[in-house]
């Protein structure tokens, strides 16, 4: 695992050093160059989408396969885990619904082949931009009106993002990570019983949440700080060349997107459904099965000693003891 993490970090640093936000974008650029150099006389058309999110209209509004970039960030914001995220408030988050991308690919494939490489960028930032601050406002409003409920059956109030620098957010998360780690180490050296055991479990849960938040900031922070705009002139020229009949079937004009309608009424409900989060108070106040089992195991009235009599796991025959 250590070797894998070091290789990932090396790839990320290499990509950053030549202007790419991560190794993913870097390898896509390398792939384009490789295809261009080896295509010989084969016609080549490259379609470059920006950040792909759920569908605008087809096959149904909100269709998406798996989670993309924004969904984990949105869910953790709704859960109260991610209270801050870096970014430039007036910056542009360049997202595009998946059905516009698929329609553009079909339209490109139907064109007469050219001897030159043709590039179509399927993006929204240069012709129908949505500001990061506006997207954050939509998300804040949505979770204010449709809150996620916690384990105690209480609605989670969404935080208001202030968009500090990425370095500041990472420092805050790493500091919290360190403090929780120290608390965990201290408590695990003491006999675990009753309320103390529940505190240890809560610290571990919180530590896991901080780890995830830090991962999202590290992975996606550069995307929301990027101020690049991608020209869609070729895409719009292709769109204008279509018949009205084709336009009604293969929609890929980014200017047609109503961002409030898309984000608030289509994408965010999809994220909630896919995330399977609790969006209403439970009818019963009973504890969850996992909470009941944990309480039973950690009951202060219980005593447990575990022995490794065959001496197969560790050198000592007493693994742990509670009394």
Where are these regions (language model features)?
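NAD(P)-dependent short-chain dehydrogenase/reductase
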Residues: 1-12, 16-25, 29-112, 135-143
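Short, solvent-exposed loop/turn segments at secondary-structure junctions
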Residues: 51-53, 126-128, 320
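Active-site neighborhood of HAD-like aspartate-dependent phosphohydrolases
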Residues: 296-323
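C-terminal capping/lid region of NAD(P)-dependent oxidoreductase domains
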Residues: 262-287
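Residue-level signal for the nucleotide or nucleotide-sugar donor/cofactor binding architecture
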Residues: 93-96, 130, 230
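Short, basic/aromatic recognition patches
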Residues: 289-296
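First extracellular/luminal loop
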Residues: 1-19, 246-268
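Mid/C-terminal beta-alpha module of Rossmann-like enzyme folds, strongest
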Residues: 108-220, 224-227, 234-241, 245-252, ...
């Amino acid at each position: 695992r250590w070797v894998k993490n070091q290789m990932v970090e090396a790839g990320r640093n290499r990509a950053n050093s030549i202007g790419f936000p991560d190794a993913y974008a870097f390898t896509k650029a390398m792939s384009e160059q490789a295809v261009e150099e080896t295509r010989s006389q084969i016609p080549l058309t490259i379609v470059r989408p920006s950040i792909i999110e759920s569908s605008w209209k087809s096959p149904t509004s909100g269709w998406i396969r798996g989670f993309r970039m924004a969904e984990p960030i949105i869910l953790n914001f709704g859960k109260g885990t991610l209270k801050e995220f870096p970014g430039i408030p007036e910056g542009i988050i360049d997202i595009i619904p998946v059905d516009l991308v698929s329609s553009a690919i079909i339209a490109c494939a139907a064109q007469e082949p050219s001897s030159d490489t043709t590039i179509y960028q399927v993006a929204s930032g240069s012709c129908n931009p949505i500001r990061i601050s506006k997207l954050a406002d939509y998300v804040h409003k949505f979770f204010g009106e449709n809150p996620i409920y916690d384990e105690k059956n209480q609605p989670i109030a969404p935080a208001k993002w202030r968009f500090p620098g990425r370095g500041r957010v990472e420092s805050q998360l790493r500091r919290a990570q360190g403090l929780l780690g120290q608390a965990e180490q201290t408590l695990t050296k003491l006999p675990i019983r009753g309320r103390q055991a529940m505190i240890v479990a809560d610290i571990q849960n919180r530590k896991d949440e901080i780890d995830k938040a830090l991962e999202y900031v590290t992975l996606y922070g550069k995307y929301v700080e990027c101020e690049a705009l991608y020209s869609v002139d070729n895409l719009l020229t292709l769109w204008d060349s279509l018949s009205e009949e084709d336009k009604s079937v293969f929609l890929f004009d980014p200017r047609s997107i109503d961002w409030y309608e898309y984000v608030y009424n289509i994408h965010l409900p999809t994220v909630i459904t896919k995330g399977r989060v609790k969006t209403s108070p439970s009818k019963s106040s009973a504890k969850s099965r996992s909470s009941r089992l944990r309480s039973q195991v950690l009951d202060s009235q219980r005593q447990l000693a575990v022995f490794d009599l065959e001496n197969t796991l560790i050198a000592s025959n007493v693994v742990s003891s509670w009394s």
